[in-house]
Amino acid sequence: MNDRNNRWRTMKDEETFEISIPFEEAPHLDSQILYRLSPSRRNVEEPPEGASPTLALMSSVKAQLHMALERNSWLQKRIEDLEEERDFLRCQLDKFISSARMDAEDYCRMKPGPRRVDGDSRAGVGEASDPESAASSFSGVSEDGSASERKRQKQKGSTSRKRFGKTKARERQRVKDADGVLCRYKKILGTFQKLKSMSRAFEHHRVDRNTVALTTPIAELLIVAPEKLAEVGEFDPSKERLLEYSRRCFLALDDETLKKVQALKKSKLLLPITYRFKR
């Protein structure tokens, strides 16, 4: 029995020894295990790599949004400039149409009508029941009167036409600088203070109301706050238009200056005209 037990133990040990032989290849198995674990570590480290494209995409979207906002603001400013230029050109067109209409009406009113006078005189002679001598004398008097009347109308029409042409040429001169704007503003202001009517003052000087409103900030700045002219600078026609210079003058009017302007407008020391610009 003891021999069997010893043999069994020996066989068991041998079997155990034989079973333990594969463990000598443990380094090979360890390398396989390490090789299998390596992809899992890579998978764990992948989320930070996947997060970087998202951040790049967000930054790109922000940049595109910023560019779109800048372009939108630029387009908005461009639209405002074009609208102001459209209003200015529309005012000039209305002014031209009204002046042409007034010229046509004045021409029709001042045009002499000799045929009508002759017809009236002949009708009077035909309807008369006096003798032939009286009719002939009456026709002679009427012809002399009509001739003198035509001559008087012709002289009157020529003088009035000359006077009207001078006024039209003087008033149609377009202002080209700040001094011209101020001079025109003071003329209209003096007429307004006499006539007590804005529309009649503009009609008297043959100037459109919107045209004056577009350049009003220049005149108000020169009258109320001439010290601010240093901030705005002198007008240079080679660098900017008069409309753009008027906008800069409007932006230079602070709250205190605007209060002074409103007070002077209420007392009729300035033209009570609204601005065409917005802050």
Swiss-Prot record:
Q: What lineage does the source organism belong to?
A: Eukaryota, Metazoa, Chordata, Craniata, Vertebrata
Q: Which organism is it from?
A: Mus musculus (Mouse)
Region Disordered, annotated ranges: 109-173
Q: Which residues form a coiled coil?
A: 62-101
> Which residue intervals are annotated with compositional bias (Basic residues) in the record?
151-167
Q: What does the UniProt record say this protein does?
A: Promotes the degradation of p53/TP53 protein and inhibits its transactivity.
The UniProt entry lists the main location of this chain as: nucleus
> What is this protein identified as?
Coiled-coil domain-containing protein 106
Q: Which UniProt keywords apply?
A: Coiled coil, Nucleus, Phosphoprotein
* Pfam families referenced in this protein's UniProt entry, alphabetically: CCDC106
Residue(s) carrying Phosphoserine: 129
| UniProt biased composition (Basic and acidic residues) | 109-121
Q: Where is this motif: Bipartite nuclear localization signal?
A: 151-164
Quaternary organization:
Interacts with p53/TP53.
